[in-house]
Amino acid sequence: MTFPKSHLDLLEYTTRAYLFLATLMPDGSPQVTPVWFNTEDGLILINTNEGRVKDKNLKARPQVAMVIQDPSDPFRYIQIRGEVTEYTREKADAHINTLSLKYRGEPWSSQPDQRRIIFKIRPLHFDAH
């Protein structure tokens, strides 16, 4: 599934839009977190530390809902429903560094106790506003 052309600018590196990620807790209640993201080959990539709530939720229940909001107009956004297709530690440290450069303008400061992981999410439905 391809992103709506009207909202492709929200995916651009220079836009620095955040993605609000909704996952499901073990009891079925939602949990929402703002995250850094980028896209690759039509997939949405996020990065987290292993052991965090979203890491556990995504591994157990791969269905997600997301919103990417225009930083300059909060009423312009795209709602996405999708599912995790893959997660990997491979190149996760390099990926978080890329995201840190995008959002903070500086390299990521790795912590020795962190184990970064990339989640790849396939969009299944878009609703652009």
Question: At which residue positions do the language-model features occur?
Answer:
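Extreme N-terminal tail/first-helix region
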Residues: 1-19
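Glycine-rich nucleotide phosphate-binding loop and flanking beta-alpha elements
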Residues: 27, 52, 125-127
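A short beta-turn/loop motif at secondary-structure boundaries
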Residues: 27-29, 70-74, 112-113
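A generic structural signal for nonpolar/aromatic side chains embedded in well-ordered alpha-helices
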Residues: 11-14, 57-58, 99, 121
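Short, surface-exposed beta-strand-loop junctions and turns on beta-sheet-rich folds
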Residues: 52-54, 73
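Short secondary-structure boundary/capping segments
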Residues: 10-11, 36, 56, 108-111
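Charged, gly/pro-rich active-site loop segments
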Residues: 1-5, 76-129
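Short beta-strand segments
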Residues: 16-50, 58, 64-68, 79
